Amino acid sequence: MDNDGINADPMELEKFSQLAHHWWDPNSEFKPLHEINPLRLNYIDEIIGGLSEKTVIDVGCGGGILSESMAARGASVTGIDLSDKALKVAKLHLLESGNQVDYRKITVEALATERPRYYDVVTCMEMLEHVPDPASVIQSCARLVKSGGWVFFSTLNRNPKSYLYAIIGAEYILRLLPRGTHEYAKFIKPSELAHMARSAGLMESGIVGMTYNPITKVYALEADTSVNYIMAFRA
């Protein structure tokens, strides 16, 4: 936590705020997010038995790529973030898409106090590796979900392969991401994520890896969790 008690890194917020106007450009720095979004959307949809009529909170929603796609499948979605610029872009895009998402600037910790046991589904994608205290985020996500509900986290594994692929490969060689997007020390092993989630009262339900083929330039969900992965938990 910073000195104001907010679980956010000001440098991380500024980094993504500077790129906010590119969120919905599929050929920008956010191209990987656009390309993996159908994969993670379908995974969530399948695991929970359909998003339609579910109440969903998207924690760290950024410009709203996942939030909007879940709303388009019939979910009642709230998206929260601490970047004013990203939220402005997200709200403006709703005018173009016609989707309905309630975007708010609030910490997940504060929302968990405001709306405990409120949501059927909690998603927190590509966020844990960017905050000072990921355990606090996980605990708050666990507080937000209804009993029997679902919580999804996606992040990066921490090992030599993930450093090679996610930082050296993605940021320096293939230039899929801007340099400095990730900090290796903040990567989280699946065992660490599972431990933090269990401590928050969640039960692990499944894990799937997300891979990228630099030859075909195609992302896929596979059993290999050595770099990117998504974990599903039940409350």
UniProtKB/Swiss-Prot annotation:
GO molecular function, one term: polyprenyldihydroxybenzoate methyltransferase activity
Metabolic or biological pathway: Cofactor biosynthesis; ubiquinone biosynthesis
Pfam families: Methyltransf_23 (PF13489)
SUPFAM superfamilies according to UniProt: S-adenosyl-L-methionine-dependent methyltransferases
CDD domains in UniProt: AdoMet_MTases
Protein's UniProt keywords contain Chaperone: no
Keyword Transferase: yes
InterPro entries: SAM-dependent_MTases_sf (IPR029063), UbiG_MeTrfase (IPR010233)
EC number(s) on file: 2.1.1.222, 2.1.1.64
EC class of the enzyme, as a word: transferase
Catalytic activity: a 3-demethylubiquinol + S-adenosyl-L-methionine = a ubiquinol + S-adenosyl-L-homocysteine + H(+); a 3-(all-trans-polyprenyl)benzene-1,2-diol + S-adenosyl-L-methionine = a 2-methoxy-6-(all-trans-polyprenyl)phenol + S-adenosyl-L-homocysteine + H(+)
Residues bound to S-adenosyl-L-methionine: 40, 60, 81, 125
Sorted UniProt keywords: Methyltransferase, S-adenosyl-L-methionine, Transferase, Ubiquinone biosynthesis
UniProt xrefs under HAMAP family: UbiG
Protein family: Belongs to the methyltransferase superfamily. UbiG/COQ3 family.
Protein known as: Ubiquinone biosynthesis O-methyltransferase
Native species: Nitrosomonas europaea (strain ATCC 19718 / CIP 103999 / KCTC 2705 / NBRC 14298)
Gene it is expressed from: ubiG
